[in-house]
Amino acid sequence: MQIRAISPADHAALLDLWRRTPGLCVRAEDAYEPFCRYLARNPELSLLAEVDGQLAGCLLVGHDGRRGYLQHLVVDMPWRGRGLARALLDEALSRLAALGVRKSHVFVLRDAPVALAFWQAQRGWGERRDIQVFSTQGDAG
């Protein structure tokens, strides 16, 4: 397995992976231009795992200078159960720590049981019950 930084050239393959992954919701922000903006704003942080030259998994990683934000941690079905998700997560946290970012958040859809089970099993990660998340599309009047 090889882990490398995601590049804009990876977008089509990643979009295909995301679309066929249960529990992952592809949104307008996953289109090519927002994807490229995200990579440019967070250089060398988002990661792709390859096995024998094939896309096996990915993790989008960003930060605001204080907190890391992890999104779209996906391992393709044939590669699950081999430690790829944990390897991607470890590498992401290492890269964030090198930037001085030690605390990270991940948002997991409630109807994604595989993802929920993964995060619940990760040592050092805990579900926050003291906050609720509110979101906007930016067009609220």
List the predicted regions and their residue ranges.
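Conserved acetyl-CoA-binding loop-helix of GNAT-fold acetyltransferases
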Residues: 75, 81-94, 121
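Short acidic, glycine/proline-enriched helix-loop-strand junctions
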Residues: 114-131
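Conserved GNAT acetyl-CoA-binding A-motif
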Residues: 96-108
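Extreme N-terminal starter segment of soluble prokaryotic enzymes
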Residues: 1-2
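Acetyl-CoA-dependent GNAT
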Residues: 5-72, 89, 95, 99, ...
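Conserved beta-strand-loop-alpha-helix junction that forms the acyl-donor binding cleft
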Residues: 106-116
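Residue-level recognition of the GNAT/N-acetyltransferase active site
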Residues: 7, 76, 80, 109
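Helix N-cap/coil-helix junction residues
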Residues: 84-85, 101, 125
